[in-house]
A protein has these predicted regions:
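Hydrophobic beta-strand segment of the Class I
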Residues: 27, 126-127
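N-terminal, positively charged/glycine-rich alpha-helical extensions of SAM-dependent methyltransferases
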Residues: 1-28, 176, 187
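Conserved alpha-helix/loop element of class I SAM-dependent methyltransferases that forms part
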Residues: 26, 36-59
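C-terminal alpha-helical "lid/dimerization" subdomain adjacent to the S-adenosyl-L-methionine
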Residues: 15, 158, 162-213, 217, ...
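A short glycine-rich, Lys/Arg-flanked "PGG" loop and its adjoining helix->strand segment in the class I
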Residues: 139-151
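A short acidic, Gly/Pro-enriched loop at the edge of an enzyme's catalytic core
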Residues: 114-125
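Core SAM-dependent methyltransferase catalytic element
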Residues: 217-244
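Class I SAM-dependent methyltransferase SAM/SAH-binding core
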Residues: 60-115
Length: 244
């Protein structure tokens, strides 16, 4: 049974990796256009949540599922901490490396978020933006993020979410499931990728459920805030003790 589960998760990861590889070149353009540039503000909020860590010269922050590096670069602005980005999709990392060549000093490492190549307790902060819902197993993914955090280290999760207000939720759902895939498909050449997006968000835990899942996987002081009416949410939690 476990073997079947592992095979299913591996197939999911490969499909997601291949999908992002196919849209890597236009990923940033579509992100900014389809979100009306609101995604930039959301990333700044992630950096603000980690400001006390980013201001420390002895700190290291890991940006997991960093994609084309937008959040890594935002974290790096005016930071004294060392930022490291990881992603399992090489074409996305190639775009990140191009941006990095413009002056930032961020190591980008090809790595799967489910099996990070770092020792236990390596990082003061960990971020994952628009990546957690793409993992094949949310619980195991959160456990892995917990593992690489130091005691009292902070995890910040930025993710597409579920608007709490019924009327807005219905309107947004129509845009997200009917309009966005058509626009995304036309611009990127892959409608499948932008049909996957609303499907993956639908399957992702609602805000309070994600709080519960984070608490169950070793995080304390878990909190969240809805962004832009709840179309995205920012969750954070602190690792207190290692999981048994």
């Amino acid at each position: 049974m476990q073997t079947q589960a592992n095979a299913k998760e591996a197939a999911h990861s490969k499909a997601v990796r291949d999908m992002f590889a196919g849209i890597a070149g236009r990923y940033d353009l579509l992100n900014h256009v389809l979100s009306l540039n609101i995604d930039r503000r959301w990333r700044r909020l992630v950096a603000n949540e980690l400001r006390d860590i980013l201001d420390r010269g002895d700190a290291t922050v890991l940006d997991v599922a960093c994609g084309t590096g937008d959040l890594s670069l935002e974290l790096n602005k005016n930071a004294k901490a060392q930022i490291i980005g990881t992603d399992f999709c090489r074409p996305m990392l190639a775009v990140a490396a191009e941006k990095n060549s413009l002056g930032a000093d961020i190591p980008f490492v090809e790595a799967d978020a489910m099996t990070l190549p770092f020792a236990d307790g390596s990082f003061d902060g960990v971020t994952i933006a628009f990546g957690l819902r793409n993992l094949p197993n949310f619980e195991n993914g959160l456990k892995e993020l917990n593992r690489v955090l130091k005691r009292n280290g902070k995890l910040v999760v930025l993710e597409c979410s579920h608007p709490p207000f019924p009327v807005f939720r219905q309107l947004y759902s129509f845009y997200f499931s009917r309009v966005l895939p058509r626009i995304g498909g036309l611009v990127s050449g892959s409608r499948r990728a932008y049909e996957y997006l609303p499907d993956s968000v639908t399957k992702f835990p609602e805000q309070e459920k994600l709080v519960e899942l984070m608490e169950a996987t070793g995080f304390d002081r878990v909190k969240y805030q809805n962004l832009t009416g709840g179309i995205a949410a920012l969750h954070s939690g602190v690792r207190v003790e290692a999981l048994a």
